[in-house]
């Protein structure tokens, strides 16, 4: 059955630390075109692969992958808040299909997602609940993480099940490429920070505002060239995007955590969401992909990209 893939970078900094107006407008046009494709496709189901930034998943139990059978968005950085329209029975069926394919995945009936998921849904569909949606969390910031190969196999297992569903499916991959915003790490953390990373759910409004202010300040310093954060790496980004565009997904299996961190920054591990999304698409057969946009945007601390793809059989 028909499938459409949309992969895009997200940023919590939009509206807080923006690049030049012409760049904001440029990104807006790319998003509008993607939104029009989705509206024309009119999906019956959305599956969104997304990371989390210590807003919904913590070290008390940190799964490598988790499928949401019920989910709500926390509304960080002004992103949409509220309940996602998750078909619980279908989410459970998908989890069972993934496990049957020998890929270990957790299941949550109380998943919380942040801007990493909600922003993509807002950009592409206009809301959290316009279409039935199954969120799939991929741990991308909290070591240890599943390998890129396992992310691909997760996507493949989901894609094979979705291809048998008889539905028009929109597959979304939401994540940054090269980037390293100021995300805290458990290793070497103070007791206070460690506790927040282990069990920091539902912070106070003041705590969330303070975290937001730190991130915005870091972005302004980064854009001004006064930062120790890892620089953006357009060369690495373009090489990664080219592998996706050419359908060379197995080549991504060899991407190691240490190499990703060294070349593209500690949050570039979010490329696992793109890998999983393309893995799901490739389960439908060979595909044709288009790189719609790429630009390094220091103000958003992001190598910012967007791609869409369809199976070749559906584009002939």
UniProtKB/Swiss-Prot annotation:
Gene that encodes it: mhpB
Per its record, how is this protein called by name?
2,3-dihydroxyphenylpropionate/2,3-dihydroxicinnamic acid 1,2-dioxygenase
The entry's family comment says:
Belongs to the LigB/MhpB extradiol dioxygenase family.
Role this protein plays:
Catalyzes the non-heme iron(II)-dependent oxidative cleavage of 2,3-dihydroxyphenylpropionic acid and 2,3-dihydroxicinnamic acid into 2-hydroxy-6-ketononadienedioate and 2-hydroxy-6-ketononatrienedioate, respectively.
Q: Would the keyword Aminoacyl-tRNA synthetase be found if you checked this record's keyword annotation?
A: no
Identify the species of origin.
Paraburkholderia xenovorans (strain LB400)
Q: What are the positions of the active site?
A: 115 (proton donor), 179 (proton acceptor)
Question: Which enzyme type, at the first EC level?
Answer: oxidoreductase
Listed InterPro entries: DHPP/DHXA_dioxygenase, Xdiol_dOase_suB
């Amino acid at each position: 059955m028909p499938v459409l893939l949309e992969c895009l970078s997200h940023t919590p900094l939009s509206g807080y630390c923006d690049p030049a107006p012409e760049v904001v407008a440029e990104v807006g046009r790319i998003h509008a075109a993607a939104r029009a494709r989705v509206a024309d496709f009119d999906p019956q189901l959305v599956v969104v692969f997304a990371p989390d930034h210590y807003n919904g998943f913590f070290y008390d139990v940190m799964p490598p992958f988790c499928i949401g059978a019920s989910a709500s968005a926390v509304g960080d950085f002004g992103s949409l808040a509220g309940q996602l329209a998750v078909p619980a029975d279908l989410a459970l069926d998908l989890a069972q299909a993934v496990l049957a394919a020998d890929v270990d995945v957790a299941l949550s009936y109380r998943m919380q997602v942040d801007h990493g998921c909600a922003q993509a849904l807002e950009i592409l569909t206009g809301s959290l609940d316009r279409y039935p949606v199954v969120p799939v969390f991929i741990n991308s910031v909290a070591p240890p993480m599943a390998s890129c190969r396992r992310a691909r196999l997760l996507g493949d297992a989901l894609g094979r099940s979705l291809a048998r569903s008889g539905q028009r499916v929109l597959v979304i991959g939401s994540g940054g490429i090269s980037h390293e915003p100021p995300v805290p790490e458990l290793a070497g953390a103070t007791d206070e920070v460690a506790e927040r990373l282990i069990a920091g759910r539902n912070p106070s409004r003041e705590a969330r505002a303070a975290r937001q202010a730190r991130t915005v300040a870091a972005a302004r310093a980064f854009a001004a060239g006064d930062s120790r954060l890892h620089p953006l790496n357009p060369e690495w980004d373009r090489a990664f995007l080219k592998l996706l565009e050419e359908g060379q997904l197995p080549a991504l299996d060899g991407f190691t955590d240490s190499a990703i961190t060294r070349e593209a920054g500690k949050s570039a591990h979010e490329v696992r969401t793109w890998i999983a999304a393309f893995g799901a698409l490739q389960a439908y057969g060979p595909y044709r992909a288009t790189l719609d946009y790429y630009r390094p945007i220091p103000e958003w601390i992001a190598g910012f990209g967007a791609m869409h793809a369809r199976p070749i059989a559906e584009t002939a």
